[in-house]
Protein backbone atom coordinates (compact mmCIF):
# COMPACT_ATOMS: atom_id res chain seq x y z
CA UNK A 1 0.00 0.00 0.00
CA UNK A 2 1.33 3.45 -0.90
CA UNK A 3 1.60 5.86 2.01
CA UNK A 4 2.24 9.55 2.52
CA UNK A 5 3.45 11.43 5.57
CA UNK A 6 0.95 13.62 7.42
CA UNK A 7 2.65 16.40 9.42
CA UNK A 8 1.36 17.56 12.78
CA UNK A 9 -0.17 20.99 13.22
CA UNK A 10 2.61 22.03 15.59
CA UNK A 11 5.29 21.23 13.03
CA UNK A 12 3.39 22.99 10.26
CA UNK A 13 3.24 26.20 12.30
CA UNK A 14 7.04 26.37 12.29
CA UNK A 15 7.10 26.69 8.51
CA UNK A 16 5.97 29.32 6.08
CA UNK A 17 3.00 28.75 3.81
CA UNK A 18 5.38 28.09 0.91
CA UNK A 19 7.44 25.56 2.85
CA UNK A 20 4.83 23.25 4.32
CA UNK A 21 6.30 20.00 3.23
CA UNK A 22 5.71 16.71 4.94
CA UNK A 23 9.02 15.73 6.48
CA UNK A 24 12.39 17.52 6.59
CA UNK A 25 13.68 19.12 3.42
CA UNK A 26 17.17 18.27 2.09
CA UNK A 27 19.69 21.03 2.52
CA UNK A 28 22.25 21.97 -0.11
CA UNK A 29 24.55 19.05 0.58
CA UNK A 30 22.83 17.35 3.48
CA UNK A 31 21.60 13.88 2.66
CA UNK A 32 19.16 13.72 5.56
CA UNK A 33 17.43 17.04 5.30
CA UNK A 34 19.88 18.95 7.52
CA UNK A 35 21.91 21.99 6.59
CA UNK A 36 24.91 21.75 4.31
CA UNK A 37 27.56 19.63 5.89
CA UNK A 38 25.29 17.29 7.82
CA UNK A 39 22.85 17.86 10.65
CA UNK A 40 19.92 15.71 11.60
CA UNK A 41 17.14 17.39 9.70
CA UNK A 42 15.88 19.78 12.40
CA UNK A 43 13.32 22.32 11.15
CA UNK A 44 14.70 25.81 10.50
CA UNK A 45 14.93 27.70 13.76
CA UNK A 46 14.15 24.59 15.78
CA UNK A 47 17.63 24.30 17.21
CA UNK A 48 16.99 20.66 17.96
CA UNK A 49 15.53 21.47 21.40
CA UNK A 50 11.83 21.87 20.58
CA UNK A 51 9.19 19.16 20.50
CA UNK A 52 9.76 16.54 17.86
CA UNK A 53 7.40 16.48 14.91
CA UNK A 54 5.11 13.49 14.94
CA UNK A 55 4.44 11.76 11.63
CA UNK A 56 1.53 9.49 10.94
CA UNK A 57 1.20 7.05 8.08
CA UNK A 58 -2.03 7.55 6.22
CA UNK A 59 -3.23 5.80 3.07
CA UNK A 60 -2.39 7.69 -0.09
CA UNK A 61 -5.45 8.10 -2.31
CA UNK A 62 -5.23 6.45 -5.72
CA UNK A 63 -4.15 8.60 -8.64
CA UNK A 64 -7.09 10.33 -10.34
CA UNK A 65 -8.44 8.67 -13.42
CA UNK A 66 -7.20 11.53 -15.59
CA UNK A 67 -3.57 11.13 -14.52
CA UNK A 68 -2.69 9.01 -17.53
CA UNK A 69 -4.95 10.73 -20.02
CA UNK A 70 -3.85 12.59 -23.10
CA UNK A 71 -3.22 16.30 -23.02
CA UNK A 72 -3.03 18.57 -26.04
CA UNK A 73 -0.24 21.07 -26.58
CA UNK A 74 -1.18 24.71 -26.89
CA UNK A 75 -0.74 26.04 -30.39
CA UNK A 76 0.52 22.76 -31.88
CA UNK A 77 -2.34 20.31 -31.37
CA UNK A 78 0.20 17.64 -30.45
CA UNK A 79 -1.08 15.08 -27.97
CA UNK A 80 1.01 13.92 -25.01
CA UNK A 81 0.81 10.65 -23.13
CA UNK A 82 2.59 9.06 -20.19
CA UNK A 83 5.43 6.74 -21.08
CA UNK A 84 3.80 3.58 -19.83
CA UNK A 85 2.78 4.28 -16.25
CA UNK A 86 5.85 6.39 -15.53
CA UNK A 87 5.53 10.13 -15.00
CA UNK A 88 7.36 11.05 -18.22
CA UNK A 89 5.12 12.78 -20.77
CA UNK A 90 6.00 12.17 -24.40
CA UNK A 91 4.44 13.32 -27.65
CA UNK A 92 2.23 10.61 -29.14
CA UNK A 93 4.22 11.01 -32.37
CA UNK A 94 8.00 10.81 -32.09
CA UNK A 95 10.78 11.19 -34.65
CA UNK A 96 13.06 8.28 -35.46
CA UNK A 97 16.47 8.56 -37.15
CA UNK A 98 16.97 5.07 -38.57
CA UNK A 99 18.13 5.08 -42.23
CA UNK A 100 17.60 8.84 -42.56
CA UNK A 101 19.97 10.76 -40.26
CA UNK A 102 23.61 10.35 -41.26
CA UNK A 103 22.66 8.22 -44.25
CA UNK A 104 19.71 8.77 -46.59
CA UNK A 105 19.29 12.52 -46.09
CA UNK A 106 21.74 15.41 -45.83
CA UNK A 107 22.51 17.10 -42.53
CA UNK A 108 20.68 20.21 -43.77
CA UNK A 109 17.53 18.20 -44.48
CA UNK A 110 17.87 16.46 -41.12
CA UNK A 111 17.96 19.86 -39.42
CA UNK A 112 14.85 20.97 -41.31
CA UNK A 113 13.02 17.79 -40.28
CA UNK A 114 14.02 18.09 -36.62
CA UNK A 115 13.07 21.78 -36.53
CA UNK A 116 9.63 21.16 -38.03
CA UNK A 117 9.07 18.29 -35.60
CA UNK A 118 10.02 20.37 -32.57
CA UNK A 119 7.95 23.36 -33.68
CA UNK A 120 4.93 21.08 -34.13
CA UNK A 121 5.17 19.77 -30.58
CA UNK A 122 7.18 16.56 -31.11
CA UNK A 123 9.36 16.11 -28.02
CA UNK A 124 10.57 12.52 -28.49
CA UNK A 125 13.63 11.89 -30.68
CA UNK A 126 14.89 8.33 -31.05
CA UNK A 127 18.26 7.04 -32.25
CA UNK A 128 20.71 4.16 -31.63
CA UNK A 129 24.42 3.51 -31.50
CA UNK A 130 24.14 1.25 -34.55
CA UNK A 131 22.29 3.72 -36.81
CA UNK A 132 24.63 4.67 -39.66
CA UNK A 133 27.51 3.36 -37.53
CA UNK A 134 27.08 6.20 -35.04
CA UNK A 135 26.58 8.97 -37.62
CA UNK A 136 22.88 9.29 -36.77
CA UNK A 137 23.73 10.13 -33.16
CA UNK A 138 26.40 12.62 -34.27
CA UNK A 139 24.00 14.33 -36.67
CA UNK A 140 21.27 14.55 -34.04
CA UNK A 141 23.73 15.85 -31.45
CA UNK A 142 25.11 18.53 -33.77
CA UNK A 143 21.62 19.79 -34.61
CA UNK A 144 20.52 19.90 -30.97
CA UNK A 145 23.67 21.82 -30.05
CA UNK A 146 23.18 24.35 -32.84
CA UNK A 147 19.52 24.88 -31.99
CA UNK A 148 20.12 25.59 -28.34
CA UNK A 149 16.73 24.29 -27.26
CA UNK A 150 16.24 23.80 -23.53
CA UNK A 151 17.39 20.30 -22.64
CA UNK A 152 14.36 19.95 -20.38
CA UNK A 153 11.99 20.47 -23.32
CA UNK A 154 12.71 17.27 -25.26
CA UNK A 155 13.27 13.56 -24.71
CA UNK A 156 16.23 11.72 -26.26
CA UNK A 157 16.28 7.94 -26.49
CA UNK A 158 19.06 5.73 -27.75
CA UNK A 159 19.54 1.99 -28.01
CA UNK A 160 22.47 -0.21 -27.04
CA UNK A 161 23.48 -3.59 -28.44
CA UNK A 162 25.45 -3.34 -31.69
CA UNK A 163 28.34 -0.96 -31.04
CA UNK A 164 31.35 -2.23 -32.95
CA UNK A 165 33.16 -5.21 -34.42
CA UNK A 166 34.92 -6.39 -31.27
CA UNK A 167 33.27 -9.10 -29.23
CA UNK A 168 33.10 -6.75 -26.24
CA UNK A 169 31.48 -3.97 -28.30
CA UNK A 170 28.12 -5.65 -28.71
CA UNK A 171 25.56 -7.34 -26.54
CA UNK A 172 24.15 -6.39 -23.16
CA UNK A 173 27.06 -7.11 -20.85
CA UNK A 174 27.61 -4.64 -18.04
CA UNK A 175 30.76 -3.55 -19.88
CA UNK A 176 29.03 -2.73 -23.16
CA UNK A 177 25.93 -1.14 -21.63
CA UNK A 178 28.12 1.31 -19.70
CA UNK A 179 30.76 1.92 -22.38
CA UNK A 180 28.23 1.90 -25.21
CA UNK A 181 26.04 4.48 -23.50
CA UNK A 182 29.04 6.69 -22.76
CA UNK A 183 29.98 6.50 -26.44
CA UNK A 184 26.45 7.49 -27.43
CA UNK A 185 26.51 10.45 -25.05
CA UNK A 186 29.81 11.61 -26.53
CA UNK A 187 28.38 11.48 -30.06
CA UNK A 188 25.16 13.18 -28.96
CA UNK A 189 27.11 15.80 -26.98
CA UNK A 190 24.73 15.32 -24.07
CA UNK A 191 25.21 14.68 -20.39
CA UNK A 192 22.42 12.11 -20.29
CA UNK A 193 19.71 10.47 -22.36
CA UNK A 194 16.16 10.27 -21.10
CA UNK A 195 15.74 6.60 -22.00
CA UNK A 196 18.30 3.95 -22.88
CA UNK A 197 16.93 0.86 -24.60
CA UNK A 198 18.34 -2.63 -24.77
CA UNK A 199 18.13 -3.00 -28.55
CA UNK A 200 17.30 -6.70 -28.39
CA UNK A 201 17.51 -9.42 -25.78
CA UNK A 202 20.85 -11.12 -25.13
CA UNK A 203 20.68 -14.86 -24.40
CA UNK A 204 24.43 -14.83 -23.64
CA UNK A 205 24.04 -12.43 -20.72
CA UNK A 206 22.34 -13.14 -17.38
CA UNK A 207 19.21 -11.07 -16.86
CA UNK A 208 20.42 -9.93 -13.45
CA UNK A 209 23.56 -8.43 -15.03
CA UNK A 210 21.47 -6.51 -17.56
CA UNK A 211 19.09 -5.09 -14.95
CA UNK A 212 21.94 -4.20 -12.59
CA UNK A 213 23.83 -2.44 -15.40
CA UNK A 214 20.75 -0.44 -16.41
CA UNK A 215 20.17 0.50 -12.78
CA UNK A 216 23.81 1.58 -12.53
CA UNK A 217 23.72 3.94 -15.54
CA UNK A 218 20.52 5.49 -14.17
CA UNK A 219 22.01 5.94 -10.70
CA UNK A 220 25.09 7.50 -12.32
CA UNK A 221 22.91 10.05 -14.13
CA UNK A 222 23.73 8.76 -17.61
CA UNK A 223 20.06 7.92 -18.26
CA UNK A 224 16.76 8.63 -16.54
CA UNK A 225 14.80 5.51 -17.55
CA UNK A 226 15.49 2.28 -19.37
CA UNK A 227 13.44 0.14 -21.68
CA UNK A 228 13.57 -2.81 -24.01
CA UNK A 229 13.33 -3.18 -27.76
CA UNK A 230 12.22 -6.32 -29.59
CA UNK A 231 12.03 -8.28 -26.36
CA UNK A 232 9.46 -10.97 -25.77
CA UNK A 233 6.76 -10.49 -23.13
CA UNK A 234 8.28 -13.24 -20.97
CA UNK A 235 11.71 -11.58 -21.10
CA UNK A 236 10.27 -8.21 -20.08
CA UNK A 237 8.44 -9.86 -17.19
CA UNK A 238 11.67 -11.58 -16.12
CA UNK A 239 13.50 -8.24 -16.07
CA UNK A 240 10.71 -6.67 -14.04
CA UNK A 241 10.70 -9.56 -11.54
CA UNK A 242 14.49 -9.39 -11.25
CA UNK A 243 14.30 -5.66 -10.52
CA UNK A 244 11.68 -6.16 -7.84
CA UNK A 245 13.58 -9.05 -6.25
CA UNK A 246 16.83 -7.12 -5.87
CA UNK A 247 15.40 -3.61 -5.40
CA UNK A 248 16.63 -2.49 -8.83
CA UNK A 249 15.02 -0.28 -11.48
CA UNK A 250 12.59 -2.04 -13.87
CA UNK A 251 12.05 -1.15 -17.55
CA UNK A 252 9.30 1.35 -18.32
CA UNK A 253 8.51 0.56 -21.96
CA UNK A 254 9.10 -1.73 -24.91
CA UNK A 255 9.88 -0.61 -28.45
CA UNK A 256 8.01 -2.87 -30.83
CA UNK A 257 7.15 -3.11 -34.50
CA UNK A 258 3.50 -2.32 -35.11
CA UNK A 259 1.54 -1.61 -38.26
CA UNK A 260 -1.47 -2.84 -40.21
CA UNK A 261 0.29 -6.12 -41.02
CA UNK A 262 2.11 -6.68 -37.70
CA UNK A 263 -0.37 -6.71 -34.84
CA UNK A 264 -0.12 -9.64 -32.42
CA UNK A 265 2.50 -8.37 -29.97
CA UNK A 266 1.31 -4.78 -29.50
CA UNK A 267 -2.39 -5.57 -29.51
CA UNK A 268 -2.44 -8.82 -27.53
CA UNK A 269 0.73 -9.23 -25.45
CA UNK A 270 1.88 -5.76 -24.41
CA UNK A 271 -1.49 -4.47 -23.09
CA UNK A 272 -1.36 -7.21 -20.46
CA UNK A 273 2.10 -6.04 -19.37
CA UNK A 274 0.87 -2.46 -19.34
CA UNK A 275 -1.90 -3.30 -16.88
CA UNK A 276 0.19 -5.68 -14.76
CA UNK A 277 3.52 -3.88 -14.44
CA UNK A 278 3.03 -0.50 -16.15
CA UNK A 279 5.25 -1.14 -19.18
CA UNK A 280 4.17 1.04 -22.10
CA UNK A 281 4.86 0.75 -25.83
CA UNK A 282 6.81 2.95 -28.22
CA UNK A 283 6.12 1.55 -31.67
CA UNK A 284 7.99 1.80 -34.95
CA UNK A 285 7.43 0.96 -38.63
CA UNK A 286 3.88 2.43 -38.70
CA UNK A 287 4.10 2.40 -42.51
CA UNK A 288 6.02 -0.89 -42.76
CA UNK A 289 9.08 0.85 -44.25
CA UNK A 290 6.90 2.72 -46.73
CA UNK A 291 4.90 -0.29 -47.88
CA UNK A 292 1.71 1.28 -46.50
CA UNK A 293 1.88 4.39 -48.67
CA UNK A 294 0.82 3.06 -52.09
CA UNK A 295 4.06 4.50 -53.50
CA UNK A 296 5.50 1.13 -54.48
CA UNK A 297 2.59 0.00 -56.66
CA UNK A 298 4.46 -3.04 -57.96
CA UNK A 299 7.76 -1.20 -58.44
CA UNK A 300 10.58 0.22 -56.31
CA UNK A 301 11.13 3.99 -56.88
CA UNK A 302 14.73 5.23 -56.78
CA UNK A 303 13.92 7.63 -53.94
CA UNK A 304 12.57 5.06 -51.46
CA UNK A 305 14.40 3.12 -48.76
CA UNK A 306 14.19 -0.17 -50.63
CA UNK A 307 16.51 1.24 -53.31
CA UNK A 308 19.27 2.26 -50.87
CA UNK A 309 22.47 0.24 -50.93
CA UNK A 310 22.48 -2.26 -48.08
CA UNK A 311 18.68 -2.56 -47.96
CA UNK A 312 18.24 -5.33 -50.50
CA UNK A 313 16.30 -7.22 -47.83
CA UNK A 314 13.63 -4.52 -47.92
CA UNK A 315 13.47 -4.60 -51.70
CA UNK A 316 13.06 -8.37 -51.57
CA UNK A 317 10.28 -7.97 -49.00
CA UNK A 318 8.42 -5.46 -51.16
CA UNK A 319 8.68 -7.68 -54.23
CA UNK A 320 7.79 -10.92 -52.42
CA UNK A 321 4.39 -12.57 -52.71
CA UNK A 322 3.47 -11.42 -49.20
CA UNK A 323 4.60 -7.91 -50.07
CA UNK A 324 2.40 -7.85 -53.16
CA UNK A 325 -0.59 -9.11 -51.18
CA UNK A 326 -0.04 -6.40 -48.58
CA UNK A 327 0.18 -3.74 -51.29
CA UNK A 328 -3.16 -4.98 -52.60
CA UNK A 329 -4.63 -4.59 -49.10
CA UNK A 330 -3.31 -1.02 -49.01
CA UNK A 331 -5.20 -0.28 -52.21
CA UNK A 332 -8.35 -1.66 -50.57
CA UNK A 333 -7.94 0.96 -47.84
CA UNK A 334 -7.94 3.88 -50.28
CA UNK A 335 -11.76 4.32 -50.18
CA UNK A 336 -11.66 4.46 -46.37
CA UNK A 337 -8.93 7.11 -46.49
CA UNK A 338 -10.84 9.12 -49.09
CA UNK A 339 -13.97 8.96 -46.95
CA UNK A 340 -12.01 10.42 -44.02
CA UNK A 341 -10.31 13.00 -46.21
CA UNK A 342 -6.79 11.75 -45.54
CA UNK A 343 -3.97 9.79 -47.12
CA UNK A 344 -3.42 6.08 -46.52
CA UNK A 345 -0.26 6.96 -44.59
CA UNK A 346 -2.18 9.27 -42.25
CA UNK A 347 -4.84 6.60 -41.77
CA UNK A 348 -2.23 3.95 -40.94
CA UNK A 349 -0.45 6.16 -38.40
CA UNK A 350 -3.71 7.18 -36.71
CA UNK A 351 -4.70 3.51 -36.59
CA UNK A 352 -1.48 2.73 -34.68
CA UNK A 353 -2.15 5.53 -32.19
CA UNK A 354 -5.48 4.08 -31.11
CA UNK A 355 -3.91 0.90 -29.68
CA UNK A 356 -4.09 0.46 -25.91
CA UNK A 357 -0.89 1.14 -24.00
CA UNK A 358 0.89 2.82 -26.94
CA UNK A 359 2.71 5.87 -25.59
CA UNK A 360 4.22 7.07 -28.86
CA UNK A 361 4.55 6.09 -32.52
CA UNK A 362 7.93 6.80 -34.12
CA UNK A 363 7.92 8.37 -37.58
CA UNK A 364 10.72 7.99 -40.10
CA UNK A 365 10.73 10.66 -42.81
CA UNK A 366 13.11 11.91 -45.49
CA UNK A 367 11.77 15.46 -45.78
CA UNK A 368 10.01 18.15 -43.79
CA UNK A 369 7.06 17.98 -46.19
CA UNK A 370 6.65 14.27 -45.54
CA UNK A 371 6.75 14.88 -41.80
CA UNK A 372 4.03 17.53 -41.99
CA UNK A 373 1.83 15.08 -43.91
CA UNK A 374 2.37 12.38 -41.31
CA UNK A 375 1.64 14.75 -38.43
CA UNK A 376 -1.78 15.19 -40.02
CA UNK A 377 -2.62 11.77 -38.60
CA UNK A 378 -3.53 13.55 -35.36
CA UNK A 379 -6.63 14.99 -37.02
CA UNK A 380 -7.57 11.56 -38.38
CA UNK A 381 -7.35 9.90 -34.97
CA UNK A 382 -10.54 11.55 -33.72
CA UNK A 383 -12.40 10.24 -36.79
CA UNK A 384 -11.54 6.60 -36.18
CA UNK A 385 -14.89 5.46 -34.85
CA UNK A 386 -15.45 1.84 -33.78
CA UNK A 387 -17.33 1.34 -37.04
CA UNK A 388 -14.36 2.59 -39.08
CA UNK A 389 -11.95 0.36 -37.17
CA UNK A 390 -14.24 -2.62 -37.78
CA UNK A 391 -14.30 -1.79 -41.48
CA UNK A 392 -10.49 -1.70 -41.57
CA UNK A 393 -10.29 -5.01 -39.70
CA UNK A 394 -12.68 -6.52 -42.23
CA UNK A 395 -10.55 -5.38 -45.16
CA UNK A 396 -7.31 -6.58 -43.59
CA UNK A 397 -8.68 -9.88 -42.29
CA UNK A 398 -5.84 -10.22 -39.76
CA UNK A 399 -7.26 -9.08 -36.43
CA UNK A 400 -5.54 -11.06 -33.66
CA UNK A 401 -7.83 -12.95 -31.31
CA UNK A 402 -7.44 -13.63 -27.62
CA UNK A 403 -6.33 -17.12 -26.66
CA UNK A 404 -8.96 -17.17 -23.93
Curated annotation (Swiss-Prot):
Its EC number is 1.1.1.-. Signal peptide: none annotated. The active site is at residue 131. GO terms for cellular component: cytoplasm; plasma membrane; voltage-gated potassium channel complex. Residues 1-77 are annotated as: Disordered. One of its GO terms (biological process) is potassium ion transport. Residues 1-14 have a biased composition (Polar residues). GO terms for molecular function: aldo-keto reductase (NADPH) activity; potassium channel regulator activity; transmembrane transporter binding; voltage-gated potassium channel activity. Residues 28-50 have a biased composition (Gly residues). It comes from the Eukaryota. It is found in: Cytoplasm. It is an enzyme of class 1 (oxidoreductase). Its main location: cytoplasm. Brain specific. Most prominent expression in cerebellum. Weaker signals detected in cortex, occipital lobe, frontal lobe and temporal lobe. Not detected in spinal cord, heart, lung, liver, kidney, pancreas, placenta and skeletal muscle. Gene3D superfamilies: NADP-dependent oxidoreductase domain. InterPro entries: K_chnl_volt-dep_bsu_KCNAB, K_chnl_volt-dep_bsu_KCNAB-rel, K_chnl_volt-dep_bsu_KCNAB3, NADP_OxRdtase_dom, NADP_OxRdtase_dom_sf. Forms heteromultimeric complex with alpha subunits. Interacts with KCNA5 and KCNB2. Regulatory subunit of the voltage-gated potassium (Kv) channels composed of pore-forming and potassium-conducting alpha subunits and of regulatory beta subunit. The beta-3/KCNAB3 subunit may mediate closure of potassium channels. Increases inactivation of Kv1.5/KCNA5 alpha subunit-containing channels. May display nicotinamide adenine dinucleotide phosphate (NADPH)-dependent aldoketoreductase activity. The binding of oxidized and reduced NADP(H) cofactors may be required for the regulation of potassium channel activity. Belongs to the shaker potassium channel beta subunit family. NCBIfam families: Kv_beta. This is Voltage-gated potassium channel subunit beta-3. It comes from Homo sapiens (Human). The gene is KCNAB3.
Amino acid sequence: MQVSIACTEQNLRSRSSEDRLCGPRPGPGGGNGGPAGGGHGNPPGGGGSGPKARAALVPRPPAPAGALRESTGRGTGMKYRNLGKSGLRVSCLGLGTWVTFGSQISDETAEDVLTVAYEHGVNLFDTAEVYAAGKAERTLGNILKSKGWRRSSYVITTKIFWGGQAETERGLSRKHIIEGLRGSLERLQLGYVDIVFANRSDPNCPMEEIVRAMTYVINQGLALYWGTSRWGAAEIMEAYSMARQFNLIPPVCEQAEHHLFQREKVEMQLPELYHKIGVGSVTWYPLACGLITSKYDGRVPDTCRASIKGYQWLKDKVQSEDGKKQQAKVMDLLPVAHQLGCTVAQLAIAWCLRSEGVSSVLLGVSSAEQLIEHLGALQVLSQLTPQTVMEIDGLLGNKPHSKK
